[in-house]
A protein has these predicted regions:
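Flexible cytoplasmic inter-helical loops of multi-pass small-molecule transporters
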Residues: 6-31, 272-279
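Loop-to-transmembrane helix entry/capping segments in MFS-fold secondary transporters
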Residues: 75-79, 167-177
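Paired intracellular helix-loop junctions of major facilitator superfamily
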Residues: 105-107, 161-170
Length: 279
């Protein structure tokens, strides 16, 4: 952050606006919301980014736990050998997909919406494959590819979020966007996947003939599972990782909704983007 501050000069306010755009002071929240209500592209994009964040935060919160349960590795091994390459791939993919969408936008303005929409859709089969294969290497490859293709929405959310409103509303538009995305994504993504996993665990235990109050997930933890009877240990072996696996697959599948919202944004951009309608 310090290097950026010292080496990158902030462009003048309105530098990227179309010629002739009048500079005005920032507006209050109410006026900003009124302008945003006339921009369907903003709300479709916000819905898509929110779903993507919801799924992403949920998956990332439980990814290491899943790898430990499903493949028998340690948390440290999951972090170093799986999560680090996935994070690197995601960082490169964020830049690559953002750059691609920006380049295509010059001739095809809809690209800023359909590139991330396609990316989110493409990530689904790779995530499902990664969460269902028994091969750790193949799981890692699936996660790496999924991480690479899905993050185009990050560039899109800021480009569209600022591009559909007048200069004086941009900061407020991004504030509204991030409030919704972070509230639902951070707040409910991990909670949702944990709750779904618990439901699958309880149902799995009952299906194997064990009362719900007789066996909890915590009792299946490797550090204490030896205290259980052989029968309960067997039940743990059946449902401990499978319940989380099912939850991860469901969460990954929800990226389809995020993809759909970005594709719905696409036809609105010609009308809603300010640089396409400078008047």
């Amino acid at each position: 952050a310090l290097v950026f501050k010292l080496t990158v000069k902030e462009p003048p306010r309105g530098y990227t606006d179309p010629p002739g755009t009048q500079s005005k002071e920032r507006v209050e929240l109410g006026e900003a919301i009124r302008e945003l209500t006339t921009k369907p592209a903003f709300w479709y994009m916000t819905a898509g980014a929110t779903v993507a964040a919801f799924c992403g935060y949920g998956i990332s919160s439980f990814q290491s736990i899943f790898l430990v349960r499903a493949h028998g590795i340690t948390a440290g091994e999951a972090a170093i050998w799986i999560n680090a390459p996935v994070s690197l791939s995601s960082a490169v993919g964020t830049f690559a997909t953002g750059w691609l969408a920006t380049q295509l936008y010059k001739k095809h303005p809809g690209a800023i919406a359909w590139v991330p929409g396609i990316g989110l859709a493409l990530s689904i089969p790779f995530y499902i494959f990664a969460f269902t294969t028994d091969n750790l290497l193949l799981a890692a490859i699936g996660l790496i590819i999924a991480g690479f293709v899905k993050y185009g929405y990050l560039a899109a959310q800021y480009t569209i979020g600022q591009g559909v409103v007048s200069m004086r509303v941009r900061a407020m538009a991004i504030a509204v966007l991030l409030f919704v995305v972070n509230l639902i994504g951070y707040g409910f993504g991990p909670l949702f996947i944990g709750a779904i996993s618990d439901i699958f665990f309880s149902n799995g235990v009952v299906e194997l003939g064990v009362a719900v109050d007789e066996l909890t997930r915590n009792q299946c933890h490797p550090s204490v599972i030896a205290e259980l009877s052989d029968n309960l240990q067997s039940v743990c072996g059946e449902v401990y990782s499978q319940s989380l696996q099912s939850a991860m697959v469901i969460m990954a599948s929800l990226y389809a909704a995020g993809s759909l919202f970005f594709l719905l944004t696409w036809p609105r951009l010609d009308k809603d983007m300010v640089d396409r309608n400078p008047s």
